[in-house]
Amino acid sequence: MSRVYNFSAGPAAIPEEVLFTVRDELLDWHGIGMSIAEVSHRGEEFIGVAEEAARDLRELLAVPESYHILFLQGGSRLQFDMVPMNLLANHKKAVYIDSGVWSNLAIREAKNYCDPHLATNAKELNYTGIPDQATWDMPNEAAYFYYVDNETVNGIEFPFIPDTDLTLVCDMSSNLLSRPFDVSRYGLIFACAQKNMGLAGLTIVIVHDDLLKRSPLPTTPSYLQYALHAKERSFINTPPTFAWYLAGLIFKWVKNQGGVAVLAERNQRKAAKLYKFIDKSNFFDNPINPTYRSRMNVIFRLADERLNSLFLKEATENGLANLKGHRLLGGMRASIYNAMTEEGVDALINFMGQFEKRHG
């Protein structure tokens, strides 16, 4: 069997060691004679899997005990609604940063519930960076301050945590577990699993206990209330058990790699070498301000975009899959999440160099 280097933005590459474990356990999990995908979500087997996954994630991210970790369904887009539904309380205003495609969608959704106040808008920079924080328009009062830590489509990543006294809410869908950060700075963090934590269909929410005391909007369905999910330990109904199990395996893998700090160093090396090659090239270009370049999603364009199809065809033939850019931006995108090896990035750089020699 020959596996390719998968640069998909999501669902994304899964560590091979994890896939081998899934293969070995799929028919008979730990000698029980059936798959973990077949057991009751309320049985002792899966309860053990779920609790261990939560403990491991808490340890990896140093999540204080004053936070609940929820394993929810619905993908990150559902959080665009759940956040205002649960956190607005008596406020009419929430603060947002428009840094790219995903924050823009969250802002549009928030308008159904409140007046989203833009602290700053990266559109004025053509989404190639974030305006200086000294220029942000920050109100003294608001329900929360929302931003996207890494914009997967635009290739922008925050190199800092915004300085604010407001309750900080962050979409970390594409870079959670990619570097250490201070969880205690945040009120709520959410991330879908299909980038760095496994399968689509699972979203992890880390929420401070104080926020669970806020009264949801009157029209909020019970299933969309964080407090109820926390009370029921994410077991209001049948959770996505296999995705939860796989996330737990990935948390074990991260621990075996040496933890989040070790992965952060590796991720920085991967991104740095790819950006270095692009910057030296006269054929490939990345428009993002270097300060805000994403370590997870490297976007680039060819000097002659008529060669895009040929580039993708030859890349696929060379075992480099899913490099096509997002439909809204075009061009190319190499998503190099935790599971992407340095060898995979080296193979991409080598191919790009050879392609430039032939067509540049």
Swiss-Prot record:
GO MF annotation terms: O-phospho-L-serine:2-oxoglutarate aminotransferase activity; pyridoxal phosphate binding
Cofactor: pyridoxal 5'-phosphate
The keyword Amino-acid biosynthesis belongs to this UniProt entry's keyword annotation: yes
Top enzyme category: transferase
EC number: 2.6.1.52
Binding site for pyridoxal 5'-phosphate: 102, 152, 171, 194, 237-238
Binding, L-glutamate: 42
One GO cellular component term: cytoplasm
GO biological process, one term: L-serine biosynthetic process
Alphabetic keyword roster: Amino-acid biosynthesis, Aminotransferase, Cytoplasm, Pyridoxal phosphate, Pyridoxine biosynthesis, Serine biosynthesis, Transferase
Keyword Cell membrane set for record: no
Catalytic activity, reaction form: O-phospho-L-serine + 2-oxoglutarate = 3-phosphooxypyruvate + L-glutamate; 4-(phosphooxy)-L-threonine + 2-oxoglutarate = (R)-3-hydroxy-2-oxo-4-phosphooxybutanoate + L-glutamate
Cofactor note: Binds 1 pyridoxal phosphate per subunit.
Residue(s) carrying N6-(pyridoxal phosphate)lysine: 195
Pathway: Amino-acid biosynthesis; L-serine biosynthesis; L-serine from 3-phospho-D-glycerate: step 2/3; Cofactor biosynthesis; pyridoxine 5'-phosphate biosynthesis; pyridoxine 5'-phosphate from D-erythrose 4-phosphate: step 3/5
Subunit structure: Homodimer.
Similarity field: Belongs to the class-V pyridoxal-phosphate-dependent aminotransferase family. SerC subfamily.
Functional description taken from the UniProt entry: Catalyzes the reversible conversion of 3-phosphohydroxypyruvate to phosphoserine and of 3-hydroxy-2-oxo-4-phosphonooxybutanoate to phosphohydroxythreonine.
Name used for this protein in its record: Phosphoserine aminotransferase
UniProt source species: Coxiella burnetii (strain RSA 331 / Henzerling II)
Gene: serC
